[in-house]
Regions:
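Single conserved hydrophobic/aromatic residue that forms the stacking wall/gate
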Residues: 1-11
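Terminal peptide-recognition signature
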Residues: 13, 69, 120
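A short glycine-rich, His/Asp/Glu-containing loop-to-beta-strand
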Residues: 18-73, 142-175
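A short beta-strand-loop-beta hairpin characteristic of the jelly-roll/cupin
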Residues: 55, 70-90, 100, 104
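"Short basic amphipathic alpha-helical interaction patches in structured regions
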Residues: 83-90, 109-111, 134-137
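Ligand-binding loop in jelly-roll beta-barrel domains
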Residues: 100-128
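Phosphate/pyrophosphate-binding betaalpha-module
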Residues: 121-134, 140-145
Length: 175
C-alpha cells in the first residue's frame, strides 16, 4: 500500500545502561534515536542472574504523557502506584501502564535465579497526553500463544495471523 515503508531503515546499536537505583540493562531504543522510532521512546531489556545487579529496582518515580509496557519472562516484580494499585508481575505476565496526566509508581524485583524481561515506553499522541492514568495487569494465562516451528509467539497486543492479542492499545494501535 501507499506509504508503507519496507526494508531496513535504521539499525540501532544497543548500549549497556544503568537505570533506576542501579539496575543493569541493555537499552535497545532510546539513546539518540527517539525521533526515528516514534511512537516508541525507549526499549530496555534486562537479563540478570545476580540479584545484586537488580534488587534495588526502580523506586518511586513519576511518568507523564507515555505508556509503559513491561513483559516478564522470568522472575517477579512488585508494582505499586499512586492510584493505589499493588500487584506482582510474575513469569509470563505483562503490565500496561498509561501515565497520561501523571502517575508515580515503583517496580521492585524480587530475588530469583534469573530476572529476564523488557520494558517499552510508548509516546502518547498529543491529544491523549493528559488522559486519566491507569494500570492494566495482563496475566500470562490470558496471553494467546501461537506455536510456529521452534518458537512460541505470545501475542500481547494487536493481531498475529488472525489471533488477537490479550489487549488492544487505546491510543497507539499495533499494526
Amino acid at each position: 500500500p501507499d506509504g508503507l515503508v519496507t526494508g531496513v531503515q535504521t539499525c540501532a546499536l544497543p548500549i549497556s545502561a544503568i537505570d533506576g537505583a542501579g539496575v543493569q540493562l541493555v537499552r535497545l531504543v532510546g539513546n539518540n534515536d527517539v525521533k526515528e522510532f516514534d511512537p516508541f521512546l525507549l526499549f530496555d531489556a534486562f537479563d540478570a542472574t545476580d540479584p545484586a545487579t537488580y534488587l534495588k529496582g526502580f523506586p518511586w518515580h513519576p511518568h507523564r504523557g507515555i505508556e509503559t509496557v513491561t513483559y516478564l519472562i522470568k522472575g517477579e516484580i512488585e508494582h505499586g502506584d499512586s492510584l493505589g494499585n499493588v500487584d506482582v508481575i510474575e513469569e509470563g505476565d505483562c503490565q500496561w501502564m498509561t501515565a497520561g496526566s501523571g502517575i508515580i509508581h515503583q517496580e521492585m524485583p524480587r530475588p530469583t535465579d534469573r530476572l529476564l524481561g523488557g520494558q517499552l515506553w510508548i509516546n502518547l499522541p498529543a491529544k491523549h497526553k493528559m488522559t486519566e492514568p491507569r494500570y492494566k495487569p495482563i496475566v500470562g494465562k490470558d496471553i494467546p500463544v501461537i506455536e510456529e516451528k521452534n518458537a512460541k509467539i505470545r501475542v500481547l497486543t494487536g493481531e498475529y495471523k488472525s489471533t488477537p492479542g490479550a489487549t488492544q492499545g487505546d491510543f497507539v494501535k499495533a499494526t
